[in-house]
Amino acid sequence: MDGIFLAEHLIKTIDERKKRIIQMLTGGSIKSMEEYRQLVGSLESLDYIGQELRDILEKAD
């Protein structure tokens, strides 16, 4: 498995997870402020990691 394939796969996985989190946040299924904070923190982390991977791929081109 080469690095570009791995990065693209990770970006796809990250984007899918972000969509699920956004659906949970907007769908009203959050039961507590603690769960809300955890999901928002996860979303921020996924955004950061996804952008770092995209930047690496862009520099590789």
Where are these regions (language model features)?
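Short, charge-rich amphipathic interface segments used for partner binding and complex assembly
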Residues: 24-61
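N-terminal acidic leader/helix
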Residues: 1-28
